[in-house]
Amino acid sequence: DKKEYGMDHLDLYKKEVYDFLDTLFDEYLSGDHPVFVGPDVHIGTDEYNLKEAEQFRYFTEYYLKYITKYGKNPRLWGSLKHMKGNTPVNLKGKTVNAWNYSWLDLETALQEGAKAINTCDAFLYIVPAVNYYHNFLDHQWIYESWSPRMMQEGEMIEQSTNLLGAMFAVWNDRVGNGI
């Protein structure tokens, strides 16, 4: 854990963190009965402290490569626009969940060969019992007015074969709220 950021953050500087995750992915992706049998594996990587951007980028690239060695298609949350740095992260052929334009430059990612799934928080996040996202999706508005190419503030991105579609996300940001 990275105590100054909360117990829910991995310490991206500790060798033990990498050893643990390597062992976990090895167990889940190999052997006679792997847990992850589908083609894709999501590595997470999102919403870390900006002061740690370079190490975050290193961690992200490390696990994109790690998952690829098992023949899996790695997925990740799009955070690299916000987590600026010099450490290269190769998104070519990787799938990013494009959840917020402030966190991911989607057009650039698509031009560089990333695949993307629109998971735009403004339209597609359900976070019950909070006042900053929806409790439910607006099905009628989505059916009548929305497009998978639509991001924040209704901005439409260019059509791309690497835009795979869209998905919604349900989060429980309030632990202990009975939901």
Name each region found by the language model.
Residues 87-94, 100-179:
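Flexible, acidic glycine-rich loops studded with aromatic residues
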Residues 3-95, 99-114:
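Active-site neighborhood of glycoside hydrolase catalytic domains
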Residues 1, 58-60, 131-135:
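Short secondary-structure boundary/capping segments
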